[in-house]
């Protein structure tokens, strides 16, 4: 019974982190995005959700402690955000928000260590089904809330309050349902894919379809990554050469290509924002302005950027620039080290089995990298995408660790400290015996 309650809570927490359930409670001020802490109801909901999370962390403290090593870089980045209170331009605000971002990171570690990858995808699938259904109902029955009537008239925003947020969520939903082959019933998976795709198109977001197209191209590349080294090396060189040529072509003809997509060369003003924030970055190069310490509307340092732009910017529309503004080169370095380590684990996991589940971590890491080039921010409190990143980092590291133990045959002699053989298949993608062997053979042999 307790396990069932815990699963329902995890599902509710994932939905809460989308901000879809609480968006209507934030108020009507155009600047409420910076001061949600002023809403007592939101603070109470936040305290309850993270309080329950802490209770489950304590209940499974051994798993949680074991996952801390796998989460080292992401936890260090969250703790740097907390430490930035010492030099923040708004220390009290930074302290409040950094405490919540640490709590969000803790939930990600708990979720990634508590549930194996197949179960995570099942929970995420139901999360996005609920999110997509509620957004469709909101747009159709409550169009004054669910459809943009101002800046982007006619574009759907659902319960998320902004068309790009809906497009981003539905993109992740598509990746989840695609990766859940063999985990969800086929009918449910196809229905989820179609619903998320329809809402992504109705949102009018341009970034989401472009990132989806890039992810589809990468999907074909994942098959190549499973090839033998004698095949992999020349194919990698060929693809790298092709990719470099494509980049040069895109840069050279960017105006024409963006015109085909209905975009300006400035990417709807994004390049102007990027140029404007460079001056602010250079004056706080190493440690930034503190977590959530820069963008404050017409107050503080962000007022100068807004004056240069002629409008009030809420973020840099680039996750890496936002991270640099808030935590400086130190924050960027921590994220880069953690991302590269996670990417390495994702590649190892991919080569362990052909199941689509094995490609989920790489798909999510690619989504993070591509989407944060034009949107932002990366590190954010009460944010589903940061919590999922932490969970995927932990899950991929643990899956690779179990795979390495299977390869070395150490699980047979490790005693009660190791996961039992019945638990092991949940952490690694299943595969049938073939050229690369069987990950879960009775003899404990792994792929070679």
Task: Specify the residue positions occupied by each region the protein language model found.
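Long extracytoplasmic/lumenal interhelical loops at the membrane interface
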Residues: 260-275, 283, 287-327, 350
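A membrane-periplasm/extracellular boundary helix in multi-pass inner-membrane enzymes
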Residues: 15, 137-143, 202-203, 223-265, ...
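Loop-to-helix entry and N-terminal half of a specific, functionally important transmembrane alpha helix
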Residues: 13-14, 314, 346-374, 385, ...
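Aromatic-anchored transmembrane helix interface
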Residues: 42-43, 70-79, 90-113, 126, ...
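Transmembrane signal-anchor hairpin modules in multi-pass inner-membrane enzymes, especially those
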Residues: 1-82, 113-122, 126, 181-187, ...
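Hydrophobic, aromatic-rich transmembrane alpha-helices
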Residues: 47-63, 171-181, 329-351
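Hydrophobic transmembrane alpha-helices and their immediate junctions
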Residues: 113, 188, 221, 327-369, ...
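Alpha-helical transmembrane segments of multi-pass inner-membrane proteins
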Residues: 50-53, 81-83, 122-151, 160-224, ...
């Amino acid at each position: 019974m307790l396990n069932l309650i815990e699963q329902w809570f995890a599902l509710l927490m994932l939905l809460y982190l989308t901000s879809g359930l609480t968006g209507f409670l934030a108020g009507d001020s155009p600047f409420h995005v910076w001061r949600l802490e002023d809403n007592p109801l939101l603070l109470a909901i936040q305290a309850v959700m993270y309080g329950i999370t802490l209770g489950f962390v304590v209940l499974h403290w051994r798993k949680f402690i074991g996952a801390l090593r796998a989460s080292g870089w992401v936890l260090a980045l969250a703790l740097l955000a907390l430490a930035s209170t010492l030099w923040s331009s708004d220390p009290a605000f930074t302290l409040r928000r950094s405490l919540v971002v640490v709590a969000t990171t803790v939930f990600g570690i708990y979720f990634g260590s508590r549930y194996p990858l197949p179960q995570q995808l099942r929970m995420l699938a139901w999360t996005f089904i609920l999110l997509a259904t509620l957004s469709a109902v909101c747009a159709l029955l409550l169009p004054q809330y669910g459809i943009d009537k101002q800046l982007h008239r006619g574009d759907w925003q659902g319960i998320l309050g902004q068309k790009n947020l809906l497009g981003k969520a539905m993109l992740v939903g598509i990746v989840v349902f695609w990766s859940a082959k063999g985990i969800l019933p086929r009918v449910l998976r196809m229905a989820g894919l179609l619903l998320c795709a329809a809402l992504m198109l109705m949102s009018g977001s341009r970034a989401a379809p472009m990132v989806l197209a890039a992810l589809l191209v990468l999907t074909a590349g994942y098959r190549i990554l499973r090839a033998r080294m004698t095949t992999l090396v020349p194919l990698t060189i060929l693809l790298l050469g092709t990719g470099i040529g494509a980049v040069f072509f895109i840069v050279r003809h960017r105006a024409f290509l963006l015109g085909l997509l209905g975009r300006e060369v400035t990417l709807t003003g994004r390049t102007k924002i990027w140029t404007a924030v460079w001056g602010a970055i250079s004056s706080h190069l190493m440690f930034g302005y503190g977590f959530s310490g820069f963008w404050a509307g017409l107050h503080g340092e962000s007022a100068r950027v807004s004056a240069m732009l002629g409008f009030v910017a809420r973020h840099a529309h680039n996750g890496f620039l936002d991270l640099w503004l808030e935590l400086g080169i130190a924050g960027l370095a921590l994220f880069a080290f953690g991302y590269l380590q996670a990417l390495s684990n994702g590649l190892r996991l991919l080569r362990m089995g052909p199941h689509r589940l094995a490609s989920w971590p790489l798909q999510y890491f690619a989504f993070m990298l591509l989407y944060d080039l034009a949107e932002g921010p990366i590190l954010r409190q009460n944010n589903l995408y940061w919590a999922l990143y932490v969970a995927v980092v932990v899950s991929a590291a643990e899956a690779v660790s179990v795979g390495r133990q299977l390869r070395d045959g150490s699980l047979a002699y490790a005693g009660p400290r190791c996961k039992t053989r019945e638990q092991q298949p949940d952490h690694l993608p299943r595969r049938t015996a073939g050229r690369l062997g069987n990950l879960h053979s009775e003899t404990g042999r792994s792929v070679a």
